[in-house]
């Protein structure tokens, strides 16, 4: 769509042209940098989880066996790349700032990825608008400042950049594009396993079909068979590479497949069953994008080239609705049934394991190229007024997402764990195991700095203790929120305290005190001005290794400490040593002024 003709002597406003990507990155730094410098993401739900893993890598880079949770578990059960970068940075700037820095890098990668991905379908100008939109996405702010899903925000942009190179490889057979695509894909896989298993496919299928549609565009003469074969080559090499780079992960998964009772999660509920679910999973992450849905459906169905992208968005949006529709549960259940029939396994429906807020983020990213076309249309017609309205809507969307945790807090009031850590690290107390009750995610903070081991932990997929896997509850520290299942799981652990060497229990919620007193624990000390109490049980023997879990071999530790982070370094080196070919274009002076009389003046 061409822009309206400009009257003589009138400047072309910046929104009427492509916004330089460097400016978009500057916007991302201005918008998110101050929040990250304030360490606002450090209060998000999973932040302490990532810092816990990073702290272990900082001290034991080539030994992923961590004895601080679940009486011992392997960190090869979670891809390590961004946590390993945190570990490296933490030696210079500390763990908290390292988390903020790594999160900032992910945020800066996102507009680059969205721009490259959007350019497959839309103009440079529209792609720059999509990149701006990615900075202000409500779903991004929800993941960064509320959920703390660092891995999701790292992996997604890497896949988007990789798929832009895959598009070049599929159409043009450029070997260097294939190499870059593979390196970036390996790096993305090293960041997050769920994004690997779902988003990589969701993002890639529209690109492949668009490459087929575009095989004759821009003077190319690619054949249908050639595009399909090159796509198969990329897919095959990707599968082989992911198996190698994440080999210790696959070994751990084979030794200990996930066999747990489903743990309740809000993203699997009907989002219209409670008002806060509607706000938390629809209004906050989607924000102003909801207003663009009619245009997305209209434009996506109307234009042939946009249909693969639209159907990918539509599919992902249905998953983003979680348990609101039966589609995700039915499809994932059917897939599990097929796998069980082929392998003879008894795999549980993945619906009961997944959380679906990340699908909203992925769907939003796929919607941005189409929404950018709407932005172009509005700005061409209404000029700076449209720019102001669109900017306001984007800013309001992000502001609401950042502010939402204040009005719907995910943590209790802050409290200090320093006295708890001090107790565990002195007088040989670390010979015994401990448990926290009512600590929430602060449990991970204790785990980072205490030398003692706990029977609890925040990573549900790594749990192997039968007292935890047979009940449908998550962390023991939050037992009461899981009803009967949570309390029964806690009671089972207390019953086997001798077996686990569980001597110390730190309680921040009086709700648990009657249960502890009945089970034989006694209150001995008070910390944090009465906020935390210590309960001790006499006669408990020192902790010893348990038979649950298989420590990785030394070779697996070496592979885990080199290949995942090495893939990201390789991708960075390739991008620096082999820059992309740039199209030759005319350099225009700024501000640009029309010197000739237009044929038609802009209607006002």
Located regions from the model:
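Luminal/periplasmic acceptor-recognition loop/helix of membrane-associated glycosyltransferases
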Residues: 454-504
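Structural motif
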Residues: 426, 495-497, 516
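Membrane-embedded transmembrane-helix bundle of lipid-linked glycan/lipid transferases
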Residues: 2-412, 416-423, 436, 445-448, ...
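Conserved short secondary-structure elements within globular domains
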Residues: 513
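Short periplasmic/luminal acceptor-recognition loop of GT-C membrane glycosyltransferases, typified by
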Residues: 425-469, 504-510
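Ligand-binding "clamshell"
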Residues: 517-523
């Amino acid at each position: 769509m061409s822009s309206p003709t400009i009257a003589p002597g009138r400047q072309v406003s910046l929104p009427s042209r492509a916004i330089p990507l460097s400016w978009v990155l500057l916007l991302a730094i201005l918008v998110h940098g101050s929040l990250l410098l304030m360490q606002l993401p450090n209060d998000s739900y999973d932040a302490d989880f990532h810092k816990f893993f990073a702290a272990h890598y900082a001290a034991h880079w080539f030994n992923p066996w961590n004895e601080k949770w679940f009486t011992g578990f392997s960190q090869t059960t979670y891809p390590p790349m961004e946590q390993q970068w945190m570990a490296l940075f933490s030696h210079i700037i500390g763990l908290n700032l390292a988390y903020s820095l790594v999160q900032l890098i992910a945020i800066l990668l996102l507009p680059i990825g969205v721009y490259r991905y959007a350019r497959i379908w839309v103009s440079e100008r529209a792609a720059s608008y999509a990149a701006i939109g990615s900075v202000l996405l409500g779903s991004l702010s929800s993941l960064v400042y509320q959920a703390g899903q660092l891995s999701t925000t790292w992996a997604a942009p890497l896949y988007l950049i990789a798929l832009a190179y895959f598009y070049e490889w599929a159409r043009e057979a450029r070997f260097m594009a294939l190499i870059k695509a593979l390196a970036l894909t390996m790096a993305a896989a090293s960041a997050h396993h769920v994004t690997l298993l779902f988003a990589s496919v969701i993002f890639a299928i529209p690109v492949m079909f668009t490459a087929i549609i575009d095989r004759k565009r821009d003077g190319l003469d690619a054949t249908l068979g050639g595009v399909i074969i090159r796509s198969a080559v990329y897919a095959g090499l990707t599968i082989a590479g992911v198996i190698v780079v994440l080999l210790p992960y696959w070994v751990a998964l084979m030794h200990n497949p996930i066999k747990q009772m489903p743990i309740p999660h809000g993203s699997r509920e009907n989002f219209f069953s409670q008002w806060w679910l509607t706000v938390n999973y629809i209004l906050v992450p989607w924000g102003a994008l909801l207003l663009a849905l009619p245009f997305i459906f209209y434009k996506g169905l109307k234009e042939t080239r946009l249909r693969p992208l639209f159907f990918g968005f539509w599919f992902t949006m249905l998953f983003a609705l979680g348990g609101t529709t039966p589609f995700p549960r039915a499809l994932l259940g059917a897939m599990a049934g097929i796998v069980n029939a082929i392998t003879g396994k008894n795999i549980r429906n993945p619906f009961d394991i997944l959380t679906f807020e990340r699908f909203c983020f992925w769907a939003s990213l796929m919607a941005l190229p189409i929404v950018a076309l709407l932005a172009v249309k509005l700005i061409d017609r209404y000029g700076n007024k449209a720019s102001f309205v669109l900017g306001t809507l984007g800013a309001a969307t992000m502001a609401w997402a950042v502010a939402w945790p204040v009005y719907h807090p995910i943590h209790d009031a802050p409290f200090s764990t320093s006295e708890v850590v001090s107790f565990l690290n002195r007088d040989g107390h670390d010979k015994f195991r401990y448990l926290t009750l009512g600590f929430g995610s602060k449990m991970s903070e204790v785990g980072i700095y205490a030398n003692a081991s706990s029977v609890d932990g925040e990573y549900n997929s790594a749990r192997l203790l039968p007292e935890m896997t047979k009940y449908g509850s998550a962390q023991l520290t939050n037992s009461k929120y899981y009803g009967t299942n949570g309390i029964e799981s806690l009671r089972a652990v207390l019953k086997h305290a001798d077996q686990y060497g569980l001597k110390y229990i730190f309680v921040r919620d009086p709700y648990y005190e009657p249960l502890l007193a009945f089970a034989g624990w006694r209150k001995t000390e008070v910390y944090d001005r009465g906020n935390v109490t210590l309960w001790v049980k006499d006669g408990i023997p020192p902790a010893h290794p348990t038979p649950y879990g298989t420590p990785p071999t030394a070779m697996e530790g070496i592979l885990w400490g080199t290949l995942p982070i090495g893939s990201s370094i390789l991708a960075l080196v390739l991008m620096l040593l082999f820059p992309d070919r740039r199209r030759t274009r005319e350099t225009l002076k700024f501000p640009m002024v029309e010197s000739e009389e237009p044929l038609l003046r802009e209607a006002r």
